[in-house]
């Protein structure tokens, strides 16, 4: 018989959610991240560095040694680009565990294997992942260990959507813009 547990007790325990962010981020960085999530402002690299460090520390506590920019390409499956928190060993032989805001915000996987990628020269087939801060990061546990999964959008270097998330994010922005326009016309 399998082990029994209360789902309510474990639900979301591997999600870098709002509660975790409030606990681990300085108040001003948390506030700036929330404003970024609402589309009011862009996130500064300094704030991204603080968020990345807090996210890394939390993920390491959960057993993660790697992170991945996780996305849904047009192939209908999920895709991941893995990197390690572990950097070159120090002179004493111990490793550094690092994760920068730049690494959090943007990745550069090869897009040549995705739809229309093979039709272009390799340098033109570049794809970029961009962190979607409106979707929470999470730790996925597996047989090979734990990995911090960072939800991202995936676009070509020309801005063409190469995933299923980017069109949804763009349509949400368009609907929001038009809804606000209509409300203003109605006097609100």
What does each model-identified segment do?
Residues 1-2, 188:
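Polar low-complexity intrinsically disordered regions
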């Amino acid at each position: 018989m399998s082990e029994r547990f209360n789902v309510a007790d474990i639900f979301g325990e591997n999600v870098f959610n709002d509660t975790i962010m409030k606990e681990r981020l300085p108040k001003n960085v948390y506030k700036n991240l929330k404003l970024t999530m609402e589309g009011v402002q862009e996130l500064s690299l300094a704030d991204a560095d603080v968020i990345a460090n807090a996210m890394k520390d939390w993920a390491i506590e959960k057993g993660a040694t790697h992170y991945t920019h996780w996305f849904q390409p047009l192939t209908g499956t999920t895709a991941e680009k893995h990197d390690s928190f572990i950097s070159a060993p120090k002179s004493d032989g111990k490793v550094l565990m690092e994760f920068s805001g730049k690494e959090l915000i943007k990745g550069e996987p090869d897009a040549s294997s995705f739809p229309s990628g093979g039709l272009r020269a390799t340098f033109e087939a570049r794809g970029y992942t961009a962190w979607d801060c409106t979707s929470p990061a999470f730790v996925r546990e597996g047989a090979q260990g734990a990995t911090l999964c960072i939800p991202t959008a995936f676009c070509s270097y020309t801005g063409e959507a190469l995933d299923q998330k980017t069109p949804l994010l763009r349509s949400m922005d368009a609907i929001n813009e038009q809804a606000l326009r209509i409300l203003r016309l109605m006097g609100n």
